[in-house]
Amino acid sequence: MGKSAVIFVERATPATLTELKDALSNSILSVRDPWSIDFRTYRCSIKNLPADVSKLMYSITFHHHGRQTVLIKDNSAMVTTAAAADIPPALVFNGSSTGVPESIDTILSSKLSNIWMQRQLIKGDAGETLILDGLTVRLVNLFSSTGFKGLLIELQADEAGEFETKIAGIEGHLAEIRAKEYKTSSDSLGPDTSNEICDLAYQYVRALEL
C-alpha cells in the first residue's frame, strides 16, 4: 500500500520552488507532467449547530488524480467526480443523468449557496512533478485572491517502508535552502481504514489549515 504526505511552507517566496528543485537535482530520475490543485474552504451558515460540529468544510480537487474532488467535513470524507466517463451508461439511458455532470463545487455555489458559503479558494497551477528513487515529489506555488500563499509539496511513495525517512530527507533539503517554517502532515483520516485519495485530501487540510 502506498503512502503520502503534504508539506506546506508558508514563509516561502515563489523562488523557493526552484531552490528546492535545484537542491533535489542530483536525486531526480525524471520529470513528469505538470499538475494543479484547487483547495476551497466553505462555511456553514446554519446557526445553532452542536458545539462539537465544525462549521467548516473543505473541497480539494486533484486534477492530477483523475480530476477527483474530495470533500472533508470533520473526520468524514466523500469522493466525487465531474468526469463524464465515470457516469454509468445505464443512468444516462434511463434518464437519471444527462451525461454532463456538474462538479460538487458548482452544486455548492449554486444550489446549496444558502447553506454553504465559500470563504476561500487557494489554487496551484503548473506544478512540477519530480521522480526520485521510490518517491514522487510534486511542487507547486499556491495563490489566493490576496496573492502568494506559500509552497506546497506533495509526497507519494508506492511502498510504505522507510517513508518517514524519505519525508525527513525532503525536510532536510528545506533546511538547506533556509525554508525552516513549514507544516507536515502524513495523517490518515481514520486509524482503522485507509483510502489513499481521502487520506491525501485530509493531509492537505491538516497542512493548509490557516
Swiss-Prot record:
Matching Pfam families: Med20
Top-level taxonomic group: Eukaryota
GO CC, alphabetical: core mediator complex; mediator complex; nucleus
UniProt-listed Gene3D superfamilies: 3.30.310.180
Subcellular location field: Nucleus
Coiled coil location: none
GO molecular function, one term: transcription coactivator activity
Disulfide bonds: none
Keyword Secreted: no
Complex formation: Component of the Mediator complex, which is composed of at least 21 subunits that form three structurally distinct submodules. The Mediator head module contains MED6, MED8, MED11, SRB4/MED17, SRB5/MED18, ROX3/MED19, SRB2/MED20 and SRB6/MED22, the middle module contains MED1, MED4, NUT1/MED5, MED7, CSE2/MED9, NUT2/MED10, SRB7/MED21 and SOH1/MED31, and the tail module contains MED2, PGD1/MED3, RGR1/MED14, GAL11/MED15 and SIN4/MED16. The head and the middle modules interact directly with RNA polymerase II, whereas the elongated tail module interacts with gene-specific regulatory proteins.
Known function: Component of the Mediator complex, a coactivator involved in the regulated transcription of nearly all RNA polymerase II-dependent genes. Mediator functions as a bridge to convey information from gene-specific regulatory proteins to the basal RNA polymerase II transcription machinery. The Mediator complex, having a compact conformation in its free form, is recruited to promoters by direct interactions with regulatory proteins and serves for the assembly of a functional preinitiation complex with RNA polymerase II and the general transcription factors.
Family: Belongs to the Mediator complex subunit 20 family.
More details: Present with 1720 molecules/cell in log phase SD medium.
Protein name from the UniProt record: Mediator of RNA polymerase II transcription subunit 20
Species classification: Eukaryota, Fungi, Dikarya, Ascomycota, Saccharomycotina
Gene: SRB2
